[in-house]
Each structure stands twice: as structure tokens, then as C-alpha cells.
């Protein structure tokens, strides 16, 4: 794939995308499609022209905190909220990986501490106003290796 083609794909990513679905399926075998943050998960991913991205995904319906002060919440409230939210941000680049168009997200900041300072590789398909992102490797979710798929629509 030419550098020019990768640049054009990068240009197509620029903007705000709203989550349509976030699914997972057991890797390497048949199994049910799961919805890690529920069928009604909500989220946005934003790509900027200067090469940065931000992704936010949540399960609706988290219990409200007992206070509006985010630094005074109880540990159990914080833990519950963290189980229903994924977020990271940093620079991004479009590359070729395993012969496929791939977006490399450099997670400078992340809700999951293990992600900060690392990168996330996502196979990337642009289909009109739809963006499909899939991690390049299976992930372990709740102890099971799964393949994930995130579908976004231009906001």
C-alpha cells in the first residue's frame, strides 16, 4: 500500500465518530456475540487533523456518585464506575500491518493504567460514513480470549 493511500485514509478518519456497536466473540472458535459494555453502549472517538485521537466508551446506567465532588467519592463508587467506562487519548498514525490498513493509537493517557504509555493497534475499514475498528490481536476479557469489533458512524 502506498504512503499516499495511507495519507488519504488518515484524512478520512478526521472528525468525530459515534459508537454504533461494540461486540466481542471468542477467538478461534464459534461462540455467541457478546456486548462487553451492553447492547446500548455509548461512545465517541475523535481524530484531529494535527494527529491526535480520543476514545470514550461507556455502559449507560451507572449509579450516580453520592457527591458531585469527583475527588470525594467512595472507593467502591469509583471502582463500579471504572468497570463501565473505557477511555484513552494520544497521538495516532495510519500504518500498514499484516497487509491491512491499521490505526496505531498511542495512549498517552488512559483510564486503564496499563494502557498509558503503550499503543493500541486497530485494523481499520472506512465504508462511507462508517468506520470499523478491530484490535489486531485477540484480547482477554473476563478471562476469555476474544476478537472485538467496534463500529462507528460519522457524527
Description of each model-found segment:
Residues 1-87, 94-155:
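Lipid interaction determinants
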Amino acid at each position: 500500500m502506498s504512503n499516499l493511500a495511507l495519507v488519504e485514509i488518515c484524512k478520512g478518519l478526521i472528525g468525530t465518530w459515534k459508537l454504533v456497536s461494540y461486540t466481542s466473540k471468542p477467538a478461534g472458535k464459534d461462540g455467541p456475540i457478546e456486548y462487553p459494555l451492553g447492547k446500548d453502549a455509548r461512545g465517541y472517538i475523535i481524530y484531529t487533523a494535527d494527529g491526535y485521537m480520543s476514545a470514550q466508551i461507556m455502559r449507560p446506567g451507572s449509579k450516580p456518585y453520592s457527591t458531585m465532588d469527583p475527588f470525594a467519592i467512595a472507593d467502591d463508587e469509583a471502582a463500579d464506575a471504572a468497570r463501565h467506562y473505557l477511555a484513552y487519548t494520544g497521538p495516532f498514525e495510519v500504518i500498514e500491518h499484516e497487509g491491512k490498513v491499521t490505526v496505531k493509537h498511542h495512549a498517552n493517557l488512559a483510564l486503564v493504567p496499563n494502557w498509558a504509555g503503550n499503543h493500541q493497534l486497530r485494523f481499520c475499514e472506512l465504508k462511507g460514513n462508517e468506520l470499523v475498528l478491530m484490535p489486531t490481536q485477540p484480547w482477554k476479557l473476563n478471562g476469555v480470549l476474544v476478537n472485538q469489533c467496534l463500529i462507528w458512524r460519522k457524527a
